[in-house]
Structure formats: C-alpha cells, structure tokens
Curated annotation (Swiss-Prot):
One of its GO terms (cellular component) is cytosol. Belongs to the class-I aminoacyl-tRNA synthetase family. Glutamate--tRNA ligase type 1 subfamily. It is an enzyme of class 6 (ligase). It is found in: Cytoplasm. Its EC number is 6.1.1.17. Monomer. This is Glutamate--tRNA ligase. Coiled coil: none annotated. ATP binds at residue 245. GO terms for biological process: glutamyl-tRNA aminoacylation. InterPro entries: aa-tRNA-synth_I_cd-bd, aa-tRNA-synth_I_codon-bd_sub2, aa-tRNA-synth_I_CS, aa_tRNA-synth_I_cd-bd_sf, Glu-tRNA-ligase_bac/mito, Glu/Gln-tRNA-synth, Glu/Gln-tRNA-synth_Ib_cat-dom, GluQ/Sye. The keyword Glycosyltransferase does not apply. It comes from Neisseria meningitidis serogroup A / serotype 4A (strain DSM 15465 / Z2491).
Amino acid sequence: MTVKTRFAPSPTGYLHIGGVRTALFSWAFARHHKGEFLLRIEDTDLARSTAESVNIILDGMKWVGLNYDNADNVVYQTRRFDRYKEVIAELLEKGHAYYCYCSKEELEAMREKAEKEGTATYDRRWRPEAGKTLPEIPAGVQPVVRFKTPLDGVTRWADLVKGEISIPNEALDDLIIARSDGSPTYNFCVVVDDYDMGVTHVIRGDDHVNNTPKQINILKAIGATLPEYGHLPMILNEQGKKISKRSGDTVAITDFGAMGILPEAMLNYLARLGWAHGDDEFFTMEQFIEWFDLKDVSPSPSRMDLKKLYWINGEHIKITPNGKLAELVKPRLALRDIHETEKPALEDVLALVKDRAQDLNTLADECLYFYVKQTPTEADVQKHWDDEAAARMLRFAERLEGLEDWNAEAIHDLFKPFCDEEGIKMGKLGMPLRLAVCGTAKTPSVDAVLALIGKEEVLKRIRA
C-alpha cells in the first residue's frame, strides 16, 4: 500500500500556523513512508474563498518548502460539483440518503426541543422507514438531501494520536449532504475527495474529531476502504489561550517571514509543537522525516514560545550558507537604503556577523555599518568618547595608514604596541575605534571588522 496523506485548507484569508503544522506532519508522515503528500483546496464557501486567498496558500506552502506531489493537479472542490452530484444520486438510489422538506421554522423548533432533551437535533420525520408514512410534500419547497445515519451501534476508530474513540450513532444527526440549491456540504465533499484521491491517512486538527464519525459512515455507505485518522492537538498562544489574530497573536505564516524567520527554522519549531524526539530541539527536515512517527505526537495542546522560535531561528542562521543568507538579507538592506553590497562582499560580512542575530531583520541591521557609518547612541558617546579619544583615533589612523598588507592579523598587531605607548588598556582603543568607524560599540572583533570595511573607508571615517 502506498501511503497517501493530504492537506486541505480553505482559502478564506491567510495560511494559519496551525494549518502549516498540520501540513508539516502530513508531509513528514508521507515522506517517512515513501508515500505521497497531496494538496486540496476546499473552496466551496464561495462567499469567502477568493483567488487571492488561494495564492496566499500556494505561496505559503512554497515559502516553507512543503512540496506536494500533485503540484500539476491540485484538487479544487469547486471543480468537482458534477462528481459530488453523481455520488449523491447513487446514495439516494441505494437508500443511503433521502430528501427532507423541513422548513427553517420546523428545524428551529426541533433544535430547541433537542437542546432540552439532549437528543439529536433532527427528528428524522422525512427519513423513509419500513411501515412509516411520510408527511405530504409541501408545495414550493426545495428539499435538502440528508444522509441516513445508522440508528444503532457505535462508530469507532483507532485514532493515531488520541487513541480509541467511539461515538454512539444515536448521538449523530442525519446530516445534510446537499443544500436546497443542490450544492454539496463540507462533510460530504471531504469524504468523496478523500475516496477519489486514495487518501490512506487523514491527519488534521482535533477540531475535526466530531466530523470523523459522520464521514466514516458516509465512506462505509459508498463502499470505501476507511483511511486511518490522526487528530492533532491545538496550538495555544503564550498565555495558554487559543491563538487569535484578534488577540494580537501572530497567526499567518507570512507574518513570520516578515519577522525574519527562516522557513527551515519555522518548520523545525512547528515540528516540536506536540512532537518530540528525545531532547532534540534543533534538527534538519531530513532528520525530521527520518524520525517522525505519529505515535510520538502528544494529544495535549502545545503552547507557543517565541523566545524558543527565535533561538531555533538563530541556530538555523548559523548553518545557512552565506550565499543563501545574502539573497535573503539584500532585500532587507535595500529597505534600509543600502543597495551596494560588493565592497565589502555581503557574504564575507555575513560570515563575520551571522552568529550575532536570531532573525534576518536583526542580521540586516548587523550589516549596516559595514556599508555606512551609523549614528552612535548618546549612551555610547557618553561612555566611550571624548576629546582625548578623538585625538587618539587620529594618532592610531596614522599607524593604520602605514600598513602595507591590510588584513585582520596586521591590524591586530598594531593594537598592543599602540596601547603600550599611550599607556592605556585595549578597551580605551577598541571602543572609541568602533564608534569612529562603525558608529556602534557592539561589533565582532574590531580587527576583522576594519579589515572587511577596507583601508580607504576606515581612514575616511576616522578622519571625518
């Protein structure tokens, strides 16, 4: 059997990080088992689904690098209405579904009664049964189509995350599978799609647990082999509440990109939300695929921890090739009005500073003074700069100007003799030198920084 999983987002605004984690676990499960990972766009909500939202999903999947095996044949539910109608007709013909002519008022009365009695909402008055007389069909009413849910027994499944789950069928409604205008409903479309796509493992959020028995019963009615189900726990915010844009939480995957998070780090972090491999916190996707198993996913909710996300991101920045980092940092430097990054070469700059940043925006800031001297903070000036320091910098500039070989080692060799002559400690040279050349007291080794900026530019800045 070829393992087939799917990710089935609804294009109604943005790609949620909870959805990305679901996609990640589905993707990793398929890759671990040498199977297929498929994408389906559940766009039947015509009022909310837009082409722009579809592109947001596709762009988000591309950004995080979750490649799907049906890239040339992504399934869109709105293109499958004929297929849904075909299956509905089959269910009606075989007696697994029926027409219901209830009015909104009747359904509301049933709902109120069911709430009081704790029973299923719909009283099945239009359900055909042996020896039962159905009401007279009202004039001018377009019926819905309902599925005939089994009246006795239980629907059970061995959930790959939550364990054994069983729901008494008497607690389930005869759900509507086609509205009065003929359009199919969510739970029905999902079943037909999973069946036609050959999905073997449905991995999704645990907000779908209540949908599962309904979908299992429909699958049985159409004669399908049941997939296995795994329901993932919710991701909570740092306060332990449901993540919500309204609460100020970052929820869209694209927002994390704007925050300077690498896609590899985002996936690494999301993988650790609910799944563990011993004490391993930092790993590559190749390692994750090798290690991943749904049995290691906790059924309990996970809590966001932005500090940990940034730490993981910093670790990924350290191992990212400088050439790749340069392509990610250049646009951020352009936003800071730095467009020329050849002198010094940005890759060389990144090699020196990338250990100092946990996100790409901070990394871009760390590169600025290599190209343009920054304005020192008042605190740095008060602490490290005075007339004596200014005069000392001019004297040290003469030593620098005399260097024939401009490199970090040669620059470093000037420090001790100069400090001895001046009767100062290294801090009295290094800190003012950083301010004079870079405009900040916080830099890597000052000899390496000066070597990269270049002799002509260093002397110009000191003497400005």
